[in-house]
Amino acid sequence: MAPNLRKSHPLLKLINNSLIDLPTPSNISAWWNFGSLLGICLLTQILTGLLLATHYTADTTLAFSSVAHTCRNVQYGWLIRNLHANGASFFFICIYLHIGRGFYYGSYLNKETWNTGVILLLALMATAFVGYVLPWGQMSFWGATVITNLFSAIPYIGQTLVEWAWGGFSVDNPTLTRFFALHFLLPFMIAGLAFIHLTFLHESGSNNPLGILSNCDKIPFHPYFSLKDILGFIIMFLPLTTLALFSPNLLGDPENFTPANPLVTPPHIKPEWYFLFAYAILRSIPNKLGGVLALAASVLVLFLTPLLHKSKQRAMTFRPLSQLLFWTLVANLLILTWVGSQPVEHPFIIIGQLASLAYFTILLLLFPIVGALENKMLNY
């Protein structure tokens, strides 16, 4: 019998084992769709970004007008830009839901997969930050100034580090040029990391909603889950195109319609919505270095989750106390996001501080305690 090319060809074999004949747990729910959605988000962002880069000029005098030119004079330039800007929001919605799923179902016990995932999140955050600076509007400029300035809180080398990153004594042309270079490079690095992420995942196989071993009941990825993924793509692209076509500036800051001016500070400097939770944590500490450390810890704490898993069960499916704690954490993150968008004044300061304290308490203290308590209640 002639060998099946799909299974024998070195390259096709790789694709086959990842996307066609991959043994997949039969009971994975729609929460397992977000990995492929992130892949399609990345592809969309790279494609639209490449088309935008062909019309963009990385120069402080021309950047703003080159973006305006793309929207006004380039065929469908407005659409490409709106898809790219709002695509970033959908990328973050998907990654946050993906992390939430991993957290709820104990997927973090695949340590290598989880750790590469956290690195992917950090790379995505860096990409989004440098990308936001490129249109060179007011919020782009001041966002870049404020966030890069945080590195000056690092003792001894801080100031040198910031000036090295800026390429001068303030955010200027060299900064914009290198941010464009980084924004172009990082998505390809993310693609490489995603491949590593998948390699580690396929080493152990997917987790499932019950958090139990599923080797006895697996089905091929194609056609079952390839079809389910396509449905996911449609469900994601519908709101994305709706947003890009009907309300493209809904999630943006009106301040960014004003060209960057180093002499005028915007009344409220705030990042895009997907960074607001971390921004609220940063602002809640009245000390610069302390704030920077808390900001870093707010994301880096994810590296610790596998070590803080004390339950004898993997998923939270049958752990009502942990579920309660999980949804409290979700609500807490929404409160932090809201506080981050508000000005720094009376009720918001204390709410932000309490929510920041609650965030770290739930993750570092309450989850392990409740996990151990549930073991005791179930006589494990």
UniProtKB/Swiss-Prot annotation:
<feature type="transmembrane region" description="Helical">
    <location>
        <begin position="321"/>
        <end position="341"/>
    </location>
</feature>
<feature type="transmembrane region" description="Helical">
    <location>
        <begin position="348"/>
        <end position="368"/>
    </location>
</feature>
<feature type="binding site" description="axial binding residue">
    <location>
        <position position="98"/>
    </location>
    <ligand>
        <name>heme b b566</name>
    </ligand>
</feature>
<keyword id="KW-0812">Transmembrane</keyword>
<dbReference type="InterPro" id="IPR036150">
    <property type="entry name" value="Cyt_b/b6_C_sf"/>
</dbReference>
<feature type="transmembrane region" description="Helical">
    <location>
        <begin position="114"/>
        <end position="134"/>
    </location>
</feature>
<keyword id="KW-0349">Heme</keyword>
<dbReference type="GO" id="GO:0006122">
    <property type="term" value="P:mitochondrial electron transport, ubiquinol to cytochrome c"/>
</dbReference>
<dbReference type="GO" id="GO:0008121">
    <property type="term" value="F:ubiquinol-cytochrome-c reductase activity"/>
</dbReference>
<dbReference type="Pfam" id="PF00033">
    <property type="entry name" value="Cytochrome_B"/>
</dbReference>
<keyword id="KW-0408">Iron</keyword>
<keyword id="KW-0472">Membrane</keyword>
<dbReference type="InterPro" id="IPR016174">
    <property type="entry name" value="Di-haem_cyt_TM"/>
</dbReference>
<feature type="transmembrane region" description="Helical">
    <location>
        <begin position="78"/>
        <end position="99"/>
    </location>
</feature>
<dbReference type="InterPro" id="IPR048259">
    <property type="entry name" value="Cytochrome_b_N_euk/bac"/>
</dbReference>
<feature type="binding site">
    <location>
        <position position="202"/>
    </location>
    <ligand>
        <name>a ubiquinone</name>
    </ligand>
</feature>
<dbReference type="InterPro" id="IPR048260">
    <property type="entry name" value="Cytochrome_b_C_euk/bac"/>
</dbReference>
<comment type="subunit">
    <text>The cytochrome bc1 complex contains 11 subunits: 3 respiratory subunits (MT-CYB, CYC1 and UQCRFS1), 2 core proteins (UQCRC1 and UQCRC2) and 6 low-molecular weight proteins (UQCRH/QCR6, UQCRB/QCR7, UQCRQ/QCR8, UQCR10/QCR9, UQCR11/QCR10 and a cleavage product of UQCRFS1). This cytochrome bc1 complex then forms a dimer.</text>
</comment>
<keyword id="KW-0479">Metal-binding</keyword>
<feature type="transmembrane region" description="Helical">
    <location>
        <begin position="227"/>
        <end position="247"/>
    </location>
</feature>
<feature type="binding site" description="axial binding residue">
    <location>
        <position position="84"/>
    </location>
    <ligand>
        <name>heme b b562</name>
    </ligand>
</feature>
<feature type="transmembrane region" description="Helical">
    <location>
        <begin position="34"/>
        <end position="54"/>
    </location>
</feature>
<comment type="function">
    <text>Component of the ubiquinol-cytochrome c reductase complex (complex III or cytochrome b-c1 complex) that is part of the mitochondrial respiratory chain. The b-c1 complex mediates electron transfer from ubiquinol to cytochrome c. Contributes to the generation of a proton gradient across the mitochondrial membrane that is then used for ATP synthesis.</text>
</comment>
<keyword id="KW-1133">Transmembrane helix</keyword>
<dbReference type="InterPro" id="IPR027387">
    <property type="entry name" value="Cytb/b6-like_sf"/>
</dbReference>
<keyword id="KW-0249">Electron transport</keyword>
<dbReference type="Pfam" id="PF00032">
    <property type="entry name" value="Cytochrom_B_C"/>
</dbReference>
<keyword id="KW-0496">Mitochondrion</keyword>
<dbReference type="GO" id="GO:0045275">
    <property type="term" value="C:respiratory chain complex III"/>
</dbReference>
<dbReference type="InterPro" id="IPR005798">
    <property type="entry name" value="Cyt_b/b6_C"/>
</dbReference>
<protein>
    <recommendedName>
        <fullName>Cytochrome b</fullName>
    </recommendedName>
</protein>
<dbReference type="GO" id="GO:0005743">
    <property type="term" value="C:mitochondrial inner membrane"/>
</dbReference>
<keyword id="KW-0813">Transport</keyword>
<keyword id="KW-0999">Mitochondrion inner membrane</keyword>
<dbReference type="GO" id="GO:0046872">
    <property type="term" value="F:metal ion binding"/>
</dbReference>
<keyword id="KW-0679">Respiratory chain</keyword>
<keyword id="KW-0830">Ubiquinone</keyword>
<feature type="transmembrane region" description="Helical">
    <location>
        <begin position="179"/>
        <end position="199"/>
    </location>
</feature>
<feature type="binding site" description="axial binding residue">
    <location>
        <position position="197"/>
    </location>
    <ligand>
        <name>heme b b566</name>
    </ligand>
</feature>
<comment type="similarity">
    <text>Belongs to the cytochrome b family.</text>
</comment>
<feature type="binding site" description="axial binding residue">
    <location>
        <position position="183"/>
    </location>
    <ligand>
        <name>heme b b562</name>
    </ligand>
</feature>
<dbReference type="InterPro" id="IPR030689">
    <property type="entry name" value="Cytochrome_b"/>
</dbReference>
